[in-house]
Amino acid sequence: MSKKLHIKTWGCQMNEYDSSKMADLLGEYQGYTLTEEAEEADILLLNTCSIREKAQEKVFHQLGRWKTLKDKNPDLIIGVGGCVASQEGKAIKDRAQCVDIIFGPQTLHRLPEMIDQVRSGEKAVIDVSFPEIEKFDRLPEPRAEGPTAFVSIMEGCSKYCSFCVVPYTRGEEVSRPMDDIILEIAQLAEQGVREVNLLGQNVNAYRGAKHDGEICTFAELLRHVAAIDGIDRLRFTTSHPIEFTQDIIDVYEDTPELVSFLHLPVQSGSDRILTAMKRGHMAIEYKSIIRRLRKARPDIQISSDFIVGFPGETAQDFQDTMKLIEDVNFDMSFSFIYSARPGTPAADLPDDVDMEEKKQRLADLQELINQQAMRYSRQMMGTVQRILVEGPSVKNPMELRGRTETNRVVNFEGLHKHIGTFVDVEIVDVFPNSLRGKFIRGEDEMDLRKSLRPEDILAKHQKADDLGVTHFKP
């Protein structure tokens, strides 16, 4: 009988990426296969997130449910990873005796050894250290699961915003070597991946070593990835305004593979609150980045993060945020009510905004952004959009689902042979969370991924002129 592994994941795309690597790791080295049912598993792993309110309590509630499974099967191994594991460490074991393994985001590569230790009789194995980039050297080769893939290019954050736990749970910024990233993406492209999303807590802080000892900037990395054969779309998540430099903006001018969609968190439109958050920039600087981006790529659409009700936020501060939203015209947002995170500087500030006021501000903010998003959607009516077909529609498996360059989901009737390829669809209807399209053409009619023979390339060269100079016409 095969050994079964169940992983429950909470939180960001980095956690989703880490969970996929845990599955690959335990599958390759110890023969575990994934199961959706916790009751079937020999190992239960909980990959946690500490961003949301009461994150710790959510973890212990889940562990309480899993304890009943361990009571029935004492050989069941339970592991807790992710940011709550980094934050709480041994305290998790003290409170939940059913837990066997506690590991941080930077030590997931040691899971096979930790499991062996538990099997050998150790009562608790805990490793929440920060061994820099070591984990990437110990992970199996990437495995594609569809036409899109996430690739982590760096770990941690060194910005220390006053409200954020990430520097304390994932460590400071550490970049992967450029060649390692290029190799991973090339391997994914060979397996049919067409779109890659570069991941990091602050990707535009990327400074990876090259093979010659020089440093690769994020802008350089974007161009290198875009040049990989088979990669037709490129995204990245998440970035920070203070390092969104002009060289990155320039990539939008000359690299069509980089999509016309950007998630750039701002958190607040009030300079006073931005200062209290230790964001390192003012509202006008954020708007300047957006202006320059739209000059380089006029059709780019922007999403962001907002925190409402930060300590000391007045009605005027909130109106400044609403003004920024009106000025920028966002396509979507992830917006939250502020709640203190233990161990962060902001946790020492008085949480002095009334909860009902926080809820009202959040509702007002979301309503404004929803209006802006719907306006963008309506502008797409009747247009032809190129989408990457990801698979069957969630609501109707007889239809297909794809995503536009601007990250909108489109459902349409089409043949399953189009899954994993690009198609053009006409937008015929608009809904709050998706679009409806009508199939126009498939990839075979688009002249995409066309291979050129040597004689084709030579044919583009004109004969030498009187000065002996040849010209190349792309």
Curated annotation (Swiss-Prot):
Q: Which Pfam families match?
A: Radical_SAM, TRAM, UPF0004
**The entry's keywords:** 4Fe-4S, Cytoplasm, Iron, Iron-sulfur, Metal-binding, S-adenosyl-L-methionine, Transferase, tRNA processing
The residues the record assigns to binding [4Fe-4S] cluster 2 are 157, 161, 164
* UniProt EC number: 2.8.4.3
Q: Could you give a GO molecular-function term held by this entry?
A: N6-isopentenyladenosine methylthiotransferase activity
* MTTase N-terminal domain sequence ranges: 3-120
The Gene Ontology CC terms held by the record are:
cytosol
What chemistry does it catalyse, as a reaction equation? Answer: N(6)-dimethylallyladenosine(37) in tRNA + (sulfur carrier)-SH + AH2 + 2 S-adenosyl-L-methionine = 2-methylsulfanyl-N(6)-dimethylallyladenosine(37) in tRNA + (sulfur carrier)-H + 5'-deoxyadenosine + L-methionine + A + S-adenosyl-L-homocysteine + 2 H(+)
Ranges for domain TRAM:
378-441
- Cellular localization per UniProt: Cytoplasm
Q: Which cofactor does it need?
A: [4Fe-4S] cluster
Q: Does the keyword Transferase apply?
A: yes
The record places domain Radical SAM core at: 143-375
Disulfide-linked positions: none
Binding-site residues, [4Fe-4S] cluster 1: 12, 49, 83
Recorded hits in InterPro entries, A to Z, give: Elp3/MiaA/NifB-like_rSAM, Methylthiotransferase, Methylthiotransferase_CS, Methylthiotransferase_N, Methylthiotransferase_N_sf, MiaB_methiolase, rSAM, rSAM_horseshoe
**Into which EC class is this enzyme placed?**
transferase
**How does the cofactor attach, per the note?**
Binds 2 [4Fe-4S] clusters. One cluster is coordinated with 3 cysteines and an exchangeable S-adenosyl-L-methionine.
Subunit organization: Monomer.
Q: Which family does it belong to?
A: Belongs to the methylthiotransferase family. MiaB subfamily.
Purpose: Catalyzes the methylthiolation of N6-(dimethylallyl)adenosine (i(6)A), leading to the formation of 2-methylthio-N6-(dimethylallyl)adenosine (ms(2)i(6)A) at position 37 in tRNAs that read codons beginning with uridine.
Q: What is this protein called?
A: tRNA-2-methylthio-N(6)-dimethylallyladenosine synthase
Tell me which species this is from: Shewanella amazonensis (strain ATCC BAA-1098 / SB2B)
